[in-house]
C-alpha cells in the first residue's frame, strides 16, 4: 500500500545520513513541511542539534513580487526546504510539500482583525479566520507559490479551513474551560467583523447569536437549533470560499499537480483537519484527495469509511497513523492499523512522524513498509 512519512526540513538539511535512513525504511514518499506553525521538536538523529525551536513561517525563499500588495505575508523561518528536497530526491524519495494554512501565531498576533474572535470577544492569535477575505488571499497566495516549488510531486494542505479553540502551547491552562461535547466547538465560533457580517447577511443578529453562544458555553442553556443552523451555514460557506479560492490558485499555478487536503467529514470539525463534505471538497475542480487523522485506532476505521462513502469515486483517501510512542501512538500495532484503514476504504497511508520517531518507532515503520508475502 502506498505509504509516505512526514518530515521537517531540519530533519534532513545538514544531516548527510537522513535521506538514506528514510529510504532504508522502505519509504518512497515524504511529506515535507514547507510552511509550518510554531514548534519545538526533537531531532534525535541530527549531527548538529537535538531540539529545534521555530516560530511560524515558511521554509523556502518567497518571491517578493508574488506577495506585493498582500495584507498578510509569511515570515521566512529558514530556507531549508530546497536542500532537504534535493537530498530526499537524490535517495529516490518523492516529495510532497506540506503547508499549514490558517494556524499561524505570528500573523494572528500581528493582524488580530484577521484572527478568530470568540463570542466573549477573546482573540485567538494562533487561529486565522477562514471567513476573512485577507486570510483567503493569504492562503491562496501561499498555496500557489508553494505549488511552484522545484522538485515537488504534490501538495498537502493542513488547517485549510476553520481552526479554533484547541491549541497545545503557551503552558496551556484551559483544560476545565471547555465542557465535553459541544464546548470546544462553541468556543471556536468566530465573531470577528467578517463573521458578524456573514451572520447578518444570513438574517441573524450577531450580538444575539453571541449571547446565545455564551449561554451555551457557560452551561446556562442549550444553543437553539435555529441559531446553530445559521452558524453552521455561514461557517460552511466561508470554509468553502477559502478552500475553493486556494484550490483554484493552485490549479492556475501548477495545472496537474495533485493536491490533498487534511479534512474531516464532521462539518463542525476544526483544527488541523477541518470539517468538509468530502463530496464537495473532492468534487469537480476540487482536491484530488483527503488526508485523515487516523491517530485513534478505535475510531479510525469509522472515520475512513464515512469519508470513503461520501467522497467521489477515485478520490485518494490517505489515513495518517501515529507512529511515535512518545506522542501516544502504538507503533507495535501499525500493521494492524494499516490493514483496518485499508479495509475501511483508505487508498494510501501516512505515518507521523519519521523525524520524531525513536529507533523502536522506526523499526515499526520499517515493518509496515515491508512488501507483503
Go through each PLM region and give its residues.
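Hydrophobic faces of well-ordered beta-strands that scaffold small-molecule active sites
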Residues: 3-7, 28-33, 95-99, 153-157, ...
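The substrate-binding groove and active-site-proximal loops of carbohydrate-active enzymes
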Residues: 4-12, 61-79, 122-137, 228-238, ...
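Active-site-adjacent "subsite" loops/lids of carbohydrate-active enzymes
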Residues: 6, 96-147
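Short, acidic/polar
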Residues: 11-24, 133-146, 269-285, 302-304, ...
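Catalytic domains of carbohydrate-active enzymes, especially glycoside hydrolases
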Residues: 16-47, 145-154, 279-291, 343-348
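Aromatic-lined carbohydrate-binding/catalytic grooves of carbohydrate-active enzymes
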Residues: 27, 31-76
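Polysaccharide-binding and catalytic clefts of secreted carbohydrate-active enzymes
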Residues: 122-253, 258-283
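Substrate-binding cleft of secreted/luminal carbohydrate-active enzymes
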Residues: 286-301, 320-373
Amino acid at each position: 500500500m502506498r505509504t509516505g512519512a512526514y518530515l521537517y526540513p531540519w530533519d534532513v538539511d545538514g544531516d548527510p545520513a537522513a535521506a538514506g535512513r528514510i529510504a532504508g525504511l522502505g519509504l518512497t514518499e515524504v511529506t515535507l513541511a514547507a510552511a509550518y506553525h510554531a514548534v519545538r521538536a526533537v531531532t534525535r538523529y541530527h549531527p548538529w542539534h537535538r531540539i529545534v525551536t521555530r516560530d511560524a513561517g515558511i521554509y523556502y525563499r518567497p518571491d517578493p513580487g508574488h506577495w506585493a500588495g498582500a495584507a498578510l505575508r509569511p515570515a521566512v523561518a529558514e530556507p531549508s526546504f530546497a536542500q532537504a528536497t534535493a537530498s530526499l530526491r537524490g535517495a529516490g524519495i518523492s516529495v510532497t510539500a506540506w503547508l499549514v494554512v490558517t494556524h499561524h501565531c505570528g500573523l494572528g498576533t500581528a493582524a488580530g482583525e484577521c484572527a478568530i474572535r470568540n463570542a466573549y470577544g477573546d482573540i485567538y492569535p494562533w487561529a486565522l479566520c477562514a471567513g476573512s477575505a485577507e486570510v483567503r488571499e493569504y492562503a491562496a497566495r501561499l498555496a500557489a507559490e508553494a505549488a511552484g516549488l522545484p522538485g515537488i510531486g504534490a501538495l498537502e494542505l493542513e488547517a485549510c479551513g476553520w481552526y479554533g479553540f484547541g491549541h497545545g502551547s503557551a503552558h496551556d491552562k484551559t483544560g476545565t474551560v471547555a465542557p465535553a461535547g459541544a464546548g470546544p466547538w462553541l468556543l471556536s465560533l468566530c465573531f470577528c467583523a467578517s463573521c458578524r457580517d456573514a451572520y447578518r447577511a444570513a438574517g441573524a443578529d450577531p450580538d444575539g447569536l453571541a449571547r446565545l453562544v455564551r449561554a451555551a458555553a457557560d452551561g446556562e442553556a442549550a444553543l437553539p437549533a435555529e441559531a446553530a443552523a445559521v452558524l453552521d451555514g455561514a461557517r460552511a460557506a466561508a470554509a468553502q470560499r477559502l478552500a475553493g479560492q486556494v484550490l483554484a490558485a493552485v490549479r492556475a499555478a501548477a495545472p496537474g499537480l495533485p493536491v490533498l487536503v487534511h479534512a474531516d467529514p464532521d462539518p463542525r470539525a476544526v483544527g488541523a483537519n477541518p470539517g468538509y463534505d468530502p463530496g464537495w471538497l473532492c468534487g469537480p475542480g476540487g482536491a484530488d484527495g483527503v488526508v485523515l487523522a487516523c491517530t485513534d485506532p478505535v475510531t479510525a476505521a469509522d472515520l475512513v469509511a464515512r469519508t470513503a462513502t461520501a467522497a467521489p469515486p477515485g478520490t485518494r483517501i490517505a489515513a495518517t497513523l501515529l507512529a511515535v510512542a512518545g506522542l501516544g501512538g502504538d507503533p507495535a500495532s501499525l500493521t494492524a492499523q494499516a490493514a483496518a484503514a485499508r479495509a475501511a476504504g483508505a487508498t494510501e497511508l501516512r505515518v507521523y512522524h519519521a523525524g520524531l520517531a525513536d529507533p523502536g518507532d522506526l523499526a515499526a515503520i520499517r515493518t509496515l513498509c515491508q512488501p507483503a508475502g
